[in-house]
Amino acid sequence: MNTVRVRDIEIGAGVPKICVPIVGVTKEDIIAEAKTFHEIPVDVVEWRVDWFEGVFDFDQVLDVLKDLREALGNTPLLMTFRTSKEGGEKAIEDAAYAELNIKAAQSGYVDLVDVEVFTGDEIVKEIIEGAHAAGVKVVASNHDFFKTPAKEDIVNRLRKMQDLGADIPKIAVMPQNKKDVLTLLAATEEMVSEYADRPIITMSMAGTGVISRLCGEVFGSALTFGAAKKASAPGQMGVNDLNTVLQLLHNAL
């Protein structure tokens, strides 16, 4: 299993890394929140750019990225436009989606970009190639806010992301019951033990699935999302509590 290194953080080694999302609407809110992150345990910051009011004007995006980079110091930055079809705030045309991600990668301010794997293989490949050419890593993602697919389906989606060249495959699914959480954990273990040659990120959402955000080191999920202020997905814990549990489990393993 290879790890993925972004700045001083090694994803896929030891304790699962903690990623904290920023979901501010205005530049002022986004930068103000970023400036508080030195007070909390955070390994990676995700800017959910789909929440930003100026997202469709790249000059405004670049302006925020520049100040975000300064506010975050050496903390790695993941930029994510989560589309409305996968639970995000806005819809976007494929060409604009590719351009936004590639331009962000080329800016020198971001360390990772997120690409939704079901955008279409050609667009996904274009973004991955563009990001890699700029020295930026790619998280390929898929989110199902309604159900938990079968174990084989989850594994196949993660394998598809790996085959397309993403550095870190990621899937988030919604449990209808406790058995669905076990399905996600079993799929994670199978992917890691049989197919993955790189770190993966998996989670079962909402309160029912919260255990999956805590036990990544046991089953093989390399990064987990915690909330500093507003959660960006159902089931996210506060970052301090999350860190406490991750460390307790790590010390017992």
Language model segments and positions:
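Catalytic alpha/beta core domains of metabolic enzymes, predominantly
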Residues: 112, 117-253
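Solvent-exposed alpha-helices and their adjacent loops that cap or buttress functional pockets
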Residues: 9-14, 70, 105-107, 162-163, ...
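Active-site beta->alpha loop and helix N-cap motifs at the rims of alpha/beta catalytic domains
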Residues: 2-4, 12-133, 143-147
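Short amphipathic alpha-helical surface micro-motifs
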Residues: 1-5, 60-61, 183-184, 206-207
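Arginine residue identity/basic-tract feature
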Residues: 5-7, 48, 69, 82, ...
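Short, Lys/Arg-enriched, disordered terminal segments
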Residues: 1-10, 251-253
